[in-house]
Amino acid sequence: MESSASCLPGFFMSFLLLQNTVLTQAMRSDIKINIQVPDTEGLLLECTSGSLIPPAEMTWRDSNGNIIPHSTAFNSQDRDGLLYLKSSILLKNRAKGPITCSIYNVTTNQEKKRSIVLPDALFKSENMSLMSNKFSCPSIYLITIIFLNFLRGILVFCCLRRKPVCFRNLMSTVMEALYSKMGVCCLLIWECLLLVLYIAFLPIYVSFRSRAFLLDDTYPLYTNWLWNICIILTVIMVLFPGLILCLLWTLNCYGQVSSLPPTSMELSTKDSEQNSSKSDDSQENYDVNCKILETCESKIFSQHQESCEDDTASTLFIS
């Protein structure tokens, strides 16, 4: 009797420990609530929980305790016989107070809850468009930047991989054709497009960030600081390339102006040298002609003098 009586407390302790283990095992899994925005018509709340001992049921309740009918429900069991529950509800109007997802286990008569408070700002159309799964402007922006960088990488790879001379000739031909048709604007767009996209990232980010809702008292301060940083960076990134372009343009114009006087002086010196050489040649020709004329005159004079002497001699001989 004494030995059997001494075993009863241990038996009851083991039974209570096992019962507590079963109760804990039945509700050991956490409840997770996710918020999704399939479109701009409402919010989709999704509640999931797993590793539950069947049977168990999942219900949604509002702040007044009223049951909210679920839009979709799903349950499954794994190999160990544990239950996995998933259900969702679609809220199109603003909810006052918390929304509760509860799981009730029939076997253990135990209930576990998880609540979520939805701010009114989440039901605004502009905030829904930020959280929706639709193709948004930031996605288009990022895809454009990735595509342009990918295109530039392909061009550089082709230039370094195969026949760089032919590729450079082709690119120079294309750039000359574009320059002849569209002028300097095309070159500026080609060179500055990525820079403009990088500069435009900050205003786009801030505009979307300001439309988001944060449960933080310092959010306005953070937004103002971010706007100031955005303005400063934008001014710097626009001002310095503008100054560099103006400096290059000024140096180019100054170089062209400074190159004009030496060119005119060289032309004048060349002309004077040519004129002097021509005058020297003409003077030499004149001297040669003068010498030729003098020799001819002297010859003619000598011949005439000889003929006169012959005539005089013949006259005297006849007489």
UniProtKB/Swiss-Prot annotation:
Encoded by one of the 11 copies of Skint genes clustered in the D1 region of the chromosome 4. May act by engaging a cell surface molecule on immature T-cells in the embryonic thymus. Residues 1-26 form the signal peptide. It is a multi-pass membrane protein. Keywords: Disulfide bond, Glycoprotein, Immunoglobulin domain, Membrane, Signal, Transmembrane, Transmembrane helix. Glycans are attached at residue 105. It comes from the Eukaryota. Expressed in skin, thymus and testis. Residues 27-139, 205-228 are extracellular. This is Selection and upkeep of intraepithelial T-cells protein 9. Residues 27-117 form the Ig-like V-type domain. Residues 161-183, 250-319 are cytoplasmic. Disulfide bonds join 47-101. Belongs to the SKINT family. InterPro entries: BTN3A2-like_Ig-C, Ig-like_dom, Ig-like_dom_sf, Ig-like_fold, IgSF_BTN/MOG. It comes from Mus musculus. It is found in: Membrane. One of its GO terms (cellular component) is membrane. The chain crosses the membrane at residues 140-160, 184-204, 229-249.
